[in-house]
Regions:
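Glycine/Thr-rich phosphate-binding loops that ligate phosphate moieties of nucleotide
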Residues: 1-156
């Protein structure tokens, strides 16, 4: 029920360091907490947004390498929650697809190995079956607040 930006509450969810960007010793940080946003809804929203903003950083890193990303495939238990896929779409600023449960990580690893072994040839494609698609208006201000906090804490 919380609004985008969790009423000014931002979380860097670095509970075990962070991989994107590579900060293995980083720690988690809640920023902007006050009496108005220290409620379960805003805390949950900040946690979801923080986790997803880490994925936005990964997408941005790929784009900086010249990879064109038009949509995002969201997998895992949390992806089944329509609120999370909607928040993800607004943070990514692009379509989010949620397939039926499957072994997508193992399949992706096998496809990547096949691609590497075949010298860059196109790996076999997988039919995702029935897919739920979500596309929401972007919320760049949430990503901006996350990145500001991330950058401010780089040397912690």
């Amino acid at each position: 029920s919380a609004t985008a930006g969790a009423n000014g509450l931002t979380l860097l969810p670095y509970f075990e360091g962070e991989r994107t960007p590579n900060r293995p010793d980083a720690t988690g940080v809640f920023s902007g907490m006050n009496l108005n946003n220290s409620n379960p809804a805003d805390i949950a929203r900040a946690m979801i947004e923080g986790m997803l903003c880490g994925l936005v950083d990964a997408v941005d890193a790929l784009e900086q390498l010249g990879v064109s990303i038009n949509r995002v495939l969201l997998i895992g238990g949390a992806a089944k929650n329509p609120a999370i896929s909607s928040i993800a779409s607004s943070l990514f600023g692009r379509e989010v697809l949620v397939p039926q449960p499957g072994e997508y990580v193992a399949d992706g690893a096998a496809r990547q190995a096949a691609w590497a072994l075949m010298g860059g040839a196109t790996p076999p494609q997988r039919n995702l079956g029935e897919v739920t698609s979500t596309h929401s208006a972007g919320t760049p201000e949430v990503v901006s607040a996350y990145r500001t906090l991330r950058d401010r804490t780089t040397n912690w």
